[in-house]
Amino acid sequence: MASKGTKLIATNKKARHDYFIEETFETGIVLVGTEVKSIRQGKLNIKDGYARVENSEVFLYNVHISPYEQGNIFNKDPLRVRKLLLHKSEIRKLIGYVQQKGYTLIPLSFYLKDGLIKVELGIGVGKKIYDKRQDIAKKDAARRIDKELRQREKQ
């Protein structure tokens, strides 16, 4: 029986660093048995992944799922294109965003939900270099403030 709840498998930290995420969608993904076993072991890389809408279907590209050790002949190409499962209304919404200049579909995380593998897909706009610098400066300032507060509490 499938376990209840969610378990995070992999996150795309680079996506949140390189893009402003405007909206997220929970999607299913079409996988083969050995890919499911490999993902459950956490052997995937989504750092370079992106999604594209083609003929009213959404496909995931450049997500590397390592071959399952005991899979032998049943293993598929690690970088193959995989179909994402969404409702028609969600796909229409994605098409509307992607047709605008600068929007990209990025996989943010893979997780298990009630025994099924789900992908969190985000709609992002690329950050400029100065935006990244501002984010880093804000994080540094927050760290300094936390450090000062901890030092004052110790005294």
Swiss-Prot record:
Q: Quick one: signal sequence residues? A: none
Per the UniProt record, the source organism is: Alkaliphilus oremlandii (strain OhILAs)
- What PROSITE patterns does the record tag this protein with? SSRP
**What is the protein's given name?**
SsrA-binding protein
Gene that encodes the chain: smpB
Entry function: Required for rescue of stalled ribosomes mediated by trans-translation. Binds to transfer-messenger RNA (tmRNA), required for stable association of tmRNA with ribosomes. tmRNA and SmpB together mimic tRNA shape, replacing the anticodon stem-loop with SmpB. tmRNA is encoded by the ssrA gene; the 2 termini fold to resemble tRNA(Ala) and it encodes a 'tag peptide', a short internal open reading frame. During trans-translation Ala-aminoacylated tmRNA acts like a tRNA, entering the A-site of stalled ribosomes, displacing the stalled mRNA.
What family does this belong to?
Belongs to the SmpB family.
Per the record, the major location class is: cytoplasm
Q: What keywords are assigned to this protein?
A: Cytoplasm, RNA-binding
Membrane-crossing segments per the record: none
* Compartment(s) of residence: Cytoplasm
